[in-house]
Amino acid sequence: MSQLPKIIIVGSGIIGASIALACQDLNADILVLEQGTSGGVASGTSFGWINASFAESSAYYALRLEAIEGFRNLGLRLDLKDSLRWQGTLWWEDAGADFDAQWTKMLSNGYAARLLNKDEVSVLEPNLVGAPERAILTYAEGAALAHETAKSILKHVSSNGGKLIENCMVTGVQSHYGRLHGVKTNVGNFDCDMLVLATGAQAQSGMDGLDWSLPMANKTGMILQTNRLPPFLNHTLMTSDVHFRQNVDGSLTAGEIFGGDFNPGANPNALATQTLERIR
């Protein structure tokens, strides 16, 4: 009987957890190493919008459609009712010719979408003050609490023989004649056949021991997460101002400065307060 390939995944966020599950489904022996606690850090500050609204090529559009279907299947497989919501999206981020171009592109792609007028938007979102004159409803879209989803995936992986070690800092990789065979950590060394660095902006720091660099353009944005609130919002709202939604647990997630143009001199708390005021 042949030995299962040993795969180490560094990072337990939504990317690392998903890779762990996919590799386990292919009969690999899985070890996930996390420097903090299960679910990672970055996934807890993810907007988590599941969509195929914007794609620069037909191949990318097809990939994103597959991702939506994959998330639906994952939700059924792992019963992600506490972290995954298929609420659809109301979009009016652009206006005029840009709005028309987006609608035309969705139609040409055959995307599940409908053009709404102001009254129709108000019916769908009765608590929305100042409804737009028109918006696009993309009703096949959803959103996930990425951190909680990652934890659910890892729980499934662990229940099927995978292992997760928390508070484990990877300090470098081990290789012999150019071939990787393990990782160095603060709690000891671990052998593996393959290694996945699912550590986002920290990926380069885990490559000590390899004569190879990973070009990255890390920029700063802002995602807001509120405490739980009574239900008042039915869809993800991609407005001309703030992007926001209400999660399964009642909390709000709001996105600001997605493009990475965050002013390093800005006061994050003041900016967060201003953003919440704009939502109100």
Question: What is each model feature region?
Answer:
Residues S2-I15, L31:
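Beta1/beta-strand and adjacent pyrophosphate-binding region of the FAD-binding site
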Residues I136-D193:
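Helical element adjacent to the flavin cofactor pocket in flavoenzyme catalytic cores
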